[in-house]
Design a protein with these regions (language model features):
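Bacterial signal peptide processing site
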Residues: 21-24
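Hydrophobic helical h-region of N-terminal Sec-dependent signal peptides
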Residues: 9-14
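N-proximal, solvent-exposed amphipathic alpha-helical segments enriched in charged/polar residues
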Residues: 30-32, 36-67
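Bacterial N-terminal signal peptides that target proteins for export
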Residues: 1-8
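C-terminal low-complexity, charged extensions that often adopt amphipathic alpha-helices
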Residues: 99-156
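Short, non-transmembrane amphipathic alpha-helical segments
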Residues: 51-57, 87-109
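Short edge beta-strands and adjacent turn/loop segments
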Residues: 59-82, 116
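C-terminal motif of bacterial Sec signal peptides marking the signal peptidase cleavage site
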Residues: 16-19
């Protein structure tokens, strides 16, 4: 009888030890050191720095004199001033190449809109200057909506 009681207590103790052991779950994945985050910052100052970086990258495209960029959310609006004498047939290739350069320079962007239309480029420059002076993005939304209406995405 005592032997059966000891076995029963031993089994109960063994069951309690196994049942109360914490589950072994894998650790959540972490970004490796030096890895890049997957989302853009929300701080407008940081977004302005990234916009300047992608504008410099777009300006490296052949036959582009100057580029201006604005970022809202995960969308970049890029305006290109082309050198004189560029034919209309070349502009699509130039815009595509600039969009590819921008996307390579900043892979966190989901959409890149590129234009060579002088009026739209002026509007983008106006918004970029306003943001650089510290104006809130909300005060420039009407202008951005008009820019977006005029543009077609070149790279998704």
């Amino acid at each position: 009888m005592k032997k059966g009681l000891h076995i029963l207590l031993l089994l109960a103790l063994l069951f309690a030890t196994v049942a109360c052991t914490p589950a072994r779950k894998p650790a959540p994945p972490t970004v490796p050191p030096g890895g890049s985050p997957t989302t853009l910052p929300t701080n407008q100052t940081e977004l302005n720095k990234i916009a300047k970086k992608i504008a410099r990258e777009a300006a490296k495209t052949e036959k582009v004199k100057r580029a201006t960029a604005v970022i809202t959310g995960s969308t970049a609006y890029v305006g290109l001033d082309l050198v004189a004498g560029v034919e209309k047939s070349e502009t699509d290739r130039i815009k595509e190449e600039a969009a590819n350069r921008v996307k390579s320079a900043e892979p966190r962007l989901k959409r890149v809109y590129v234009t060579t239309d002088a009026d739209t480029v002026t509007r983008i420059r106006h918004v970029a200057e306003g943001l650089a002076k510290g104006r809130p993005l909300s005060s420039l939304m009407r202008e951005l909506d008009e820019i977006k209406r005029r543009m077609v995405p070149k790279r998704k």
